[in-house]
Amino acid sequence: MRPRFFVVYLIAALVIAVDQWTKQWAASTIPPLIGYTVIPGFFDLVNVRNRGAAFGFLNRSDIEWQFWLFFAAAVTAVLAIIAMTRSAKSNPYLFTGFGLIMGGAIGNLIDRIRFRAVIDFLDFHIGGYHWPAFNVADMGICVGAFFVCLAVYKHK
């Protein structure tokens, strides 16, 4: 296996493992829709199911097509990352980003297949502002996108 694939797959595997472990922990420890306050007025641990995308986008129970949309998006992202990893020049920022995005996409895809929804459990809020609950896979996707942008910026 070429080193670039090893790096991408190793990072993806780590994200998937941490994501699935933390979701299992949250689902078995935190009462659904109740949660625990960790830092009053700022951070709670919750146990919610999100049928939509990251941060609650399209989280509606009255539409079924979003399962297939997000399923197809995750599979397409993984296949695109594999293809781009083959053709990309060596760039640690790019390969780190690819691994994080791939791991996040697969982590959430596992939930979609198992539960038809994604387990979200990290809930941040301050004052009247509330950020939608999210999970480790969502963080992988967002941080991975940052690394890909950084790779593009550094390449110029």
Curated annotation (Swiss-Prot):
One of its GO terms (molecular function) is aspartic-type endopeptidase activity. Pfam families: Peptidase_A8 (PF01252). One of its GO terms (biological process) is proteolysis. It comes from the Bacteria. It catalyses: Release of signal peptides from bacterial membrane prolipoproteins. Hydrolyzes -Xaa-Yaa-Zaa-|-(S,diacylglyceryl)Cys-, in which Xaa is hydrophobic (preferably Leu), and Yaa (Ala or Ser) and Zaa (Gly or Ala) have small, neutral side chains. One of its GO terms (cellular component) is plasma membrane. The active site is at 120, 138. This is Lipoprotein signal peptidase. The lineage of its organism: Bacteria, Pseudomonadati, Thermodesulfobacteriota, Desulfovibrionia, Desulfovibrionales.
